[in-house]
């Protein structure tokens, strides 16, 4: 549950977390500092944070940490204890992939299986922010086109930590190698996209199937009025049980579900459909989503 203390609610800000050892994080931070006026805030002793800045318009906080992002379980409580309650947590981060694809990515966090090697807890999902993920990804896409940046702009599936967060959160990333992490143009694009974030409610789905980069879900997010919360790729579906789906629906505030049908085994489709029916969620086909929710201009 998020804190309902009026003082904390009024003081809650969109909080951007920048990690000292993360080159992309520092690149994004440099551009955030250049794009807005910021004032330093005093930190209480032993807060665990290196520095905190607040934007002159009072909308954002920028928090420096010395550790990497994925192990920041309980960060929302730590921020609150330091008098810095968050309305939304955005991890400005690098993305690494074996394929070394140049990319700008957005995703929420969670562990579908009993493994939690990269932070978080097994079988636990963080609270997602579908409106924020949509607005940031759409602005990344727009700016990449304007600036002629030939990067993939994509939604990733739910993965890694932190998961122990009751405040909505997301990752905004530059991928996938050191060369890209320090490039000025991607850093500026991610920073600008973060600063245009919207929390206005949008029709939201949970997604099942597809690969790590959730291509069909990305297309629907960019081309219609909907967004996605948690997404589970085809290679994780064996771990997706009723408890995890219930978590995904609740922590995405989802109204319906979407299947990348061709990528899913029929047994998984049937099993997950039955669970969703029990939870009162319809599965909409891509054609139904496009017809009902139209296209973004």
Swiss-Prot record:
Class of enzymatic activity (EC top level): hydrolase
The protein, known as: D-aminoacyl-tRNA deacylase
One Gene Ontology MF term: D-aminoacyl-tRNA deacylase activity
GO biological process, one term: D-amino acid catabolic process
Cofactor note as given: Binds 2 Zn(2+) ions per subunit.
Keywords, in A-Z order: Hydrolase, Metal-binding, Zinc
Catalytic activity: a D-aminoacyl-tRNA + H2O = a tRNA + a D-alpha-amino acid + H(+); glycyl-tRNA(Ala) + H2O = tRNA(Ala) + glycine + H(+)
Pfam families: tRNA_deacylase
Quaternary assembly: Monomer.
Entry function: D-aminoacyl-tRNA deacylase with broad substrate specificity. By recycling D-aminoacyl-tRNA to D-amino acids and free tRNA molecules, this enzyme counteracts the toxicity associated with the formation of D-aminoacyl-tRNA entities in vivo.
Family statement drawn from the similarity comment of this UniProt entry: Belongs to the DtdA deacylase family.
Cofactor(s) the protein requires to work: Zn(2+)
Protein EC: 3.1.1.96
């Amino acid at each position: 549950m998020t804190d309902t203390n009026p003082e904390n609610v009024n003081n809650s800000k969109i909080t951007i977390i920048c990690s000292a050892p993360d080159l992309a994080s520092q690149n994004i931070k440099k551009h955030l500092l250049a794009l807005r006026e910021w004032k330093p805030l005093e930190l209480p002793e032993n807060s665990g944070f290196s520095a905190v800045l607040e934007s002159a318009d009072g909308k954002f906080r920028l928090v420096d940490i010395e550790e990497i992002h994925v192990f920041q379980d309980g960060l929302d409580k730590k921020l609150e204890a330091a008098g810095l309650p968050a309305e939304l947590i955005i991890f400005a981060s690098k993305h690494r992939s074996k394929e070394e694809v140049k990319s700008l990515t957005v995703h929420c966090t969670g562990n579908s299986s009993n493994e939690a090697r990269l932070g978080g807890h097994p079988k636990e999902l963080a609270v997602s922010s579908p409106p924020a993920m949509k607005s940031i990804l759409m602005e990344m896409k727009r700016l990449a086109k304007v600036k002629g940046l030939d990067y993939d702009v994509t939604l990733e599936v739910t993965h890694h930590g932190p998961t122990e967060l009751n405040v909505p959160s997301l990752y905004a990333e530059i991928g996938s190698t050191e060369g890209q992490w320090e490039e000025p143009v991607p850093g500026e694009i991610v920073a600008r996209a973060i600063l245009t974030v919207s929390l206005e409610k949008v029709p939201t789905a949970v997604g099942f199937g597809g690969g790590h980069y959730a291509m069909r879900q990305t297309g629907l997010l960019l081309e219609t009025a909907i967004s996605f919360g948690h997404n589970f790729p085809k290679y994780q579906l064996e771990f997706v049980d009723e408890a995890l789906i219930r978590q995904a629906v609740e922590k995405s505030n989802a109204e319906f579900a979407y299947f990348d049908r061709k990528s899913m085994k029929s047994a998984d489709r049937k099993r997950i459909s039955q669970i969703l029916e029990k939870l009162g969620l319809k599965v909409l086909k891509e054609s139904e989503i496009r017809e009902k929710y139209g296209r973004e201009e």
